[in-house]
Amino acid sequence: MTEKLKNSKEVIAYIAECFPKCFTLEGEAKPLKIGIFQDLAERLSEDEKVSKTQLRAALRQYTSSWRYLHGVKLGATRVDLDGNECGVLEEEHVEHAKATLAESKAKVQARRKEQAQKARDEEKSKPKTKKAPQQRRANKPQAQKPAKQPVETRALNADELITGKAVNVNMGKGNMAATIVEINKDDVRVQLSNGLQMVVKAEHLRA
């Protein structure tokens, strides 16, 4: 018996493997043909790994991702499952994608602020414990702790700016580990270790 795929992420990876000229897992995604769900359902109707419900949910997740919405722009062409062109995007679809992308980014930003505020509130609500007075020691010099050495990083070379490269993002107060997901001239999309994605300038990336 064929084992069904467990979630939308696995389904997206599977259909990208079956239809590589239409679906991608990295870089800018291509706008999909209108009605592609029906084509997909027909082509995979005999496939026991995936159901129509899973396909519909996976398509919804794929087309609402920032990577896909970035690819919906004026002049871009829709493609079918085999990568054949199916007409240029209409302006109203481009504007809708822009609005959806802006709304999605605003929600993420609001969620981050809410989490940061919650963390601050929890910190304030913690009971403060009074430190017991330290007994003075008779003229015993305290051993100095060795200073913590900062992790040394360096600026990335141009040939190191590749998708999948593990890098550090300079966040001002320190570096955060990340992986390069997409490169668009000087703008680089990275995924942080906590799963969040963000666009930064190449000059802020370090090895």
Swiss-Prot record:
Residues 100-156 are annotated as: Disordered. Residues 111-126 have a biased composition (Basic and acidic residues). The keyword Chaperone applies. GO terms for biological process: post-transcriptional regulation of gene expression. It is found in: Cytoplasm. Residues 127-139 have a biased composition (Basic residues). One of its GO terms (molecular function) is RNA strand annealing activity. The keyword RNA-binding applies. Transmembrane segments: none annotated. Keywords: Chaperone, Cytoplasm, RNA-binding. GO terms for cellular component: cytosol. SMART domains: ProQ. Its main location: cytoplasm. Coiled coil: none annotated. RNA chaperone with significant RNA binding, RNA strand exchange and RNA duplexing activities. HAMAP family: ProQ (MF_00749). Belongs to the ProQ family. This is RNA chaperone ProQ. The gene is proQ.
